[in-house]
Amino acid sequence: MGRYSREPEIAAKSCKARGSNLRVHFKNTCETANAIRKMPLKRAVAYLKNVIGHKECVPFRRFNGGVGRCAQAKQWGTTQGRWPKKSAEFLLQMLRNAESNADYSGLDVDRLVIEHIQVNRAACLRRRTYRAHGRINPYMSSPCHIEMWLTEAESTPEGAKKGKKKKGTKDAVEKSSKRVKTAATAAH
């Protein structure tokens, strides 16, 4: 068993998965992992399948030099996005591994949320490409290590979610301003 960068707060309610020296681009995998962080497990699996099928994109926020724009990135509040198929496949495989670990531990798979996911650089692998006039250039690959753990979310009553509205939301402000206007017109 390898060492993780962090440990979950409640180990009994969480499951882990990790992969080392994976032959998949570090930068693409980092952006894909950032997109699925804090997602429920079922939504993350559906999202990664949509990325593979080009139905949803992965927003590129940090490693975005030379990345083209796409309309699907608007739902993430950015303009640049791609569909890193291989990264999505590797993360999907790791999520399945974590799901089977959770099932083995007796956790409720439907309530799992990706609490922690981290992508680190692995040692670069060196190859060579032959250039004109007898020169040789490096042909490097950037593999990565991935670690994640999922925890069971606390179930909250659905009535409490739907019934309460935040104080400063747009709807609440509009309603209060309408009340003030009607009270002002009634006074005159």
Swiss-Prot record:
InterPro entries: Ribosomal_uL22 (IPR001063), Ribosomal_uL22_CS (IPR018260), Ribosomal_uL22_euk/arc (IPR005721), Ribosomal_uL22_sf (IPR036394). One of its GO terms (molecular function) is structural constituent of ribosome. PANTHER family: 60S RIBOSOMAL PROTEIN L17. Belongs to the universal ribosomal protein uL22 family. This is Large ribosomal subunit protein uL22. GO terms for biological process: cytoplasmic translation. GO terms for cellular component: cytosolic large ribosomal subunit. The keyword Ribosomal protein applies. It comes from Agriotes lineatus (Lined click beetle). Transmembrane segments: none annotated. Residues 155-188 are annotated as: Disordered. Keywords: Ribonucleoprotein, Ribosomal protein.
